[in-house]
């Protein structure tokens, strides 16, 4: 008889010490993660925890591709559309919410299944060591920096209002090592670091040393025992699928959702507006609304409800119509950015293996995506995934960590690389830099850069001779 979860209160004393078992399903967008998680309920008593950063927010159900109530098939789903759209929900927030939730699910003798493509969310739960903990724990001990508003006040009182507006440059002067770790536009993190220094006299980089930095992202001493599954498919097949999915989203009401959330001059770095498919329509909506309100489009009513209903009609305007061109370009940008996203997600999964030593089981959904056959889905996806999980539940040894890897590439958390050939693109850490150098775009630009430099050098030499 299979033991579902060794952490249940009814298990014998020695088994109570064993870690609870958690299934993780990750992978690129469009690969079928949510569908697999729901179908596993036919084989195991599962509860699903959403690990998609945008699906956590309420709203934009079509655009973020949330599983519908019908698609959930009665399987319990958690953290799906539960966070206010304007809130910032960090990896630490996700971890702090999810860990107790996993324990709660285990107490019901059910199997928690963590599902999503936001791999830094998953990493925050799977790894016991979250790199930002040291800094944030220090903040919590200091009443002067208890909120974002207070952080601004602390930084302003010490460095002045003018310096506050140039926070990244100030941080580079104070602690260049810490500045290298974050993006120049990450104002929340910049203020966090500056407030630490202002209130405690501590260099942020000093906090990221020792055990936390050494074990960051690894599964050493993890809270639970993890079965790590990655849904995958050929990139070209996923490209075609996500493009078709965007078209289907437009038919299903994507434009209505974007219209509802549109706000001129909105902050696209926080909350639900970070979603792919929001910012891409900003220019189109700005022109569309201004012309409609000015009465230039007599064929469309100014009534809010009717305007939303007529958005898709713009796609039937003459091909040379400015609004139709802008709308089609916006839809194409959504497709492009979605294709880019799935490539980033694939790279991140690979990094979890090569850099952090995760033992990941891959399930190839290519045949199903091409055929749309439920027979193929069951044979190529559900059956192998169920066998992997069944073996995981029956084994006594931990499954998530691969002891033979994880140190294959030295992790460099603090070094920033700048690629001049690619327009001064910033890469953080040796792994990102090495991966970037192998890319086709970088190689092409490097070749052009070298040829251009050779030509310039030849011109200089000829000028000196003459």
Swiss-Prot record:
Residues 456-466 have a biased composition (Basic and acidic residues). The keyword Nucleotide-binding applies. The keyword Methyltransferase does not apply. GO terms for cellular component: cytosol. Residues 52-55 are annotated as: Interaction with substrate tRNA. Belongs to the IPP transferase family. PANTHER family: TRNA DIMETHYLALLYLTRANSFERASE (PTHR11088), TRNA DIMETHYLALLYLTRANSFERASE 2 (PTHR11088:SF82). Catalyzes the transfer of a dimethylallyl group onto the adenine at position 37 in tRNAs that read codons beginning with uridine, leading to the formation of N6-(dimethylallyl)adenosine (i(6)A). Involved in the cis-type cytokinin biosynthesis. This is tRNA dimethylallyltransferase 2. The lineage of its organism: Eukaryota, Viridiplantae, Streptophyta, Embryophyta, Tracheophyta.
């Amino acid at each position: 008889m299979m033991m579902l979860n060794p952490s249940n209160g009814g298990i014998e004393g020695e088994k109570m010490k064993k870690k609870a078992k958690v299934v993780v399903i990750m992978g690129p967008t469009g690969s079928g993660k949510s569908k697999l998680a729901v179908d596993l309920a036919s084989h195991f008593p599962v509860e699903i925890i959403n690990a998609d950063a945008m699906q956590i927010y309420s709203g934009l159900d079509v655009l973020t591709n949330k599983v519908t109530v019908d698609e959930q098939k009665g399987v319990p789903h958690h953290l799906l559309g539960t966070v206010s759209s304007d809130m910032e929900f960090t990896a630490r927030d996700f971890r702090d919410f999810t860990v107790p939730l996993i324990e709660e699910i285990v107490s019901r003798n059910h199997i928690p299944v963590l599902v999503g493509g936001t791999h830094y969310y998953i990493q925050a739960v799977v790894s016991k060591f979250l790199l930002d903990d040291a800094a944030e724990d220090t903040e919590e001990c200091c009443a002067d920096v208890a909120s974002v508003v207070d952080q601004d006040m602390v930084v302003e009182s010490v460095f002045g209002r003018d310096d506050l507006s140039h926070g990244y440059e100030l941080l580079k002067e104070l602690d260049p090592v810490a500045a290298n770790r974050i993006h120049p536009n990450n104002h929340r993190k910049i203020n966090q670091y500056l407030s630490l220094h202002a209130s405690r006299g501590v260099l942020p980089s000093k906090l990221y040393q020792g055990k936390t930095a050494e074990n960051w992202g690894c599964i050493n001493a993890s809270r639970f025992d993890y079965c790590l599954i990655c849904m995958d498919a050929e990139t070209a097949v996923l490209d075609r699928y996500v493009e078709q999915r965007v078209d289907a989203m437009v038919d299903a009401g994507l434009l209505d959702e974007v219209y509802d959330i549109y706000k001129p001059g909105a902050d696209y770095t926080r909350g639900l507006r970070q979603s792919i498919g929001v910012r891409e329509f900003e220019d189109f909506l700005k022109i569309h609304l201004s012309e409609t309100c000015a009465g230039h489009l007599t064929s469309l009513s100014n009534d809010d409800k009717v305007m939303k209903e007529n958005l898709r009609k713009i796609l039937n305007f003459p091909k040379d119509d400015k609004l139709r061109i802008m709308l089609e370009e916006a839809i194409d940008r959504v497709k492009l950015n979605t294709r880019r996203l799935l490539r980033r997600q694939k790279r991140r999964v690979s990094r979890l293996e090569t850099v952090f030593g995760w033992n990941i089981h891959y399930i190839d959904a290519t045949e199903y995506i091409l055929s749309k056959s439920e027979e193929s889905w069951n044979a190529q996806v559900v059956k192998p995934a169920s066998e992997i999980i069944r073996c995981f539940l029956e084994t006594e040894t931990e499954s998530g960590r691969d002891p033979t890897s994880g140190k294959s590439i030295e992790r460099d958390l603090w070094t920033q690389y700048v690629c001049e050939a690619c327009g001064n693109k910033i890469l953080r850490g040796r792994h990102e830099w090495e991966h970037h150098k192998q890319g086709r775009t970088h190689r092409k630009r490097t070749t052009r850069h070298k040829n251009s430099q050779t030509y310039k050098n030849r011109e200089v030499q000829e000028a000196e001779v003459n």
